[in-house]
């Protein structure tokens, strides 16, 4: 636990009064940590840590649905919410920088139809959209109207390491090597994603921080993502499978790939199925599930291979790597390796940037290079379209768009 006493309070074995969080006065919150956390300020900027009004939270279970009780401390406040239609906001007169804010009001239209979003943008009803039909992406990329922002996230395949078949790291590696990552980003997802040659994505800070080589650059590639090397990757994979007792896939049991049935996930699953069957000679069934059912099955370990993805909560490799610690809450792979745990412990035991990153690189080497627990497919990007008459919009690689200081020509 990062905050002193959290684990004991969370499991009910200690009184909440023992938690290492104290309101020193009306303006000061003191948080006692169990270790020196270099990214703590970034965590405090994460939405889950934002302050809320206690009286409003306790007034109703539906307090977030009513503009009169949905009270925050940001630059804009909600004035109207027509559910499944739009949310209207206006400048918050109590905001510390009120005088410098941009538009008096901002209206967010709620749509789940990508075609409707694009139509609304093209006819001038919408100034900004972050989704459009997949088959339209190449056209708008070519025209320069579609922007592609960096996004600190990775889409990957997760192996159940406790499954009888995928308990062998060499079999996991074989299944990873035959994934044609370039084909998937160019012909299936088509949103400017970057083929992944490791787990921690581009843009995550290394020891030297922002403006220097990032964690991925320093860590290098775990396999080649070059088109020219794809056949060599497949040859290596077939040899690994043969060494495991399955030459050309002979005798390999039928396996199941699990995914949810929304968006491109099913199409990516079909592409993976074809690659594994064609290159390894194995039989793969697809199990497309409702989102909530899929999440629960993956969490419970009721799968062999499953699609997965992770978006950073803060810009530090810890956001990606500590989740695979033995018995971690997000450790869907059911993975456990004492050497990996020791590397994570070492990273958390020091505040020295070089030592921290050395330990995190060692952890990724074990996770991907040695144990092949995951098969990274691509690094996320964030496509969006913005009215060229809008100035001052700010986007962060953590996936947040800020409109509070915008202006329209």
Segments from the language model and where they lie:
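Alpha-to-beta junction loops
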Residues: 27-29, 117, 122-131, 275, ...
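Structural transition elements
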Residues: 195-243, 262-266
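Gly/Pro-rich hinge or "lid" segments in bacterial periplasmic/extracellular proteins
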Residues: 3-18, 27, 33-101, 105, ...
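Alpha-helical secondary-structure segments
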Residues: 26-30, 74-75, 103-105, 123, ...
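A ligand-binding cleft/hinge motif common to bilobed small-molecule-binding domains
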Residues: 131-142, 312-317
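Detector for C-terminal structural segments
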Residues: 49, 179-211, 263-273, 296-409
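Ligand-site clamp/hinge motif
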Residues: 93-138
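Ligand/substrate-recognition segments at binding pockets and active sites
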Residues: 83, 227-234, 240-312, 353, ...
């Amino acid at each position: 636990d990062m905050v002193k006493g959290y684990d004991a309070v969370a499991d009910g074995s200690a009184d909440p009064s023992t938690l290492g969080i104290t309101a020193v006065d009306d303006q000061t919150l003191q948080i006692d940590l169990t270790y020196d956390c270099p990214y703590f300020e970034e965590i405090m900027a994460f939405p889950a840590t934002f302050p809320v009004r206690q009286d409003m939270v306790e007034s109703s279970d539906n307090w977030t649905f009513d503009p009169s009780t949905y009270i925050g401390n940001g630059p804009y406040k909600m004035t109207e919410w027509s559910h499944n239609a739009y949310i209207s906001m206006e400048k918050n007169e109590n905001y510390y920088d009120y005088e410098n804010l941009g538009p008096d009001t901002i209206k967010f239209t709620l749509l789940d139809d990508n075609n409707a979003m694009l139509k609304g943008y093209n006819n001038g009803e919408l100034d900004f959209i972050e989704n459009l039909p997949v088959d339209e992406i190449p056209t708008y990329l070519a025209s320069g109207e579609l922007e592609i922002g960096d996004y600190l996230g990775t889409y990957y395949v997760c192996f159940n390491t406790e499954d009888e078949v995928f308990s062998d790291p060499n079999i996991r590696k074989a299944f990873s090597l035959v994934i044609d990552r370039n084909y998937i980003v160019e012909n299936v997802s088509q949103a400017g994603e970057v083929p992944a040659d490791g787990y921690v994505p581009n843009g995550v800070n290394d020891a030297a921080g922002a403006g220097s080589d990032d964690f991925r650059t320093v860590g290098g590639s775990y396999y080649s993502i070059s088109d020219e090397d794809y056949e060599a990757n497949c040859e290596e994979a077939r040899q690994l499978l043969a060494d495991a007792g399955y030459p050309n896939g002979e005798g390999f049991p039928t396996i199941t790939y699990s995914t949810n049935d929304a968006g491109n996930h099913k199409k990516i699953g079909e592409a993976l199925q074809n690659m594994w069957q064609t290159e390894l000679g194995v039989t793969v069934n697809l199990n497309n599930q409702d989102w909530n059912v899929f999440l629960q099955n993956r969490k419970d370990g009721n799968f062999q291979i499953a699609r997965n993805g992770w978006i950073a909560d803060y810009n530090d490799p810890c956001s990606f790597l500590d989740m695979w610690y033995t018995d971690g809450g997000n450790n869907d792979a059911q993975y456990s390796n004492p050497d990996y745990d020791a590397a994570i412990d070492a990273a958390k035991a020091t505040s020295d940037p070089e030592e921290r990153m050395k330990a995190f690189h060692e952890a990724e080497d074990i996770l991907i290079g040695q144990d092949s627990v995951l098969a990274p497919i691509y690094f996320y990007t964030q496509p969006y379209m913005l009215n060229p008459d809008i100035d001052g919009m700010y986007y962060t690689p953590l996936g947040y768009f800020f409109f509070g200081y915008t202006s329209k020509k």
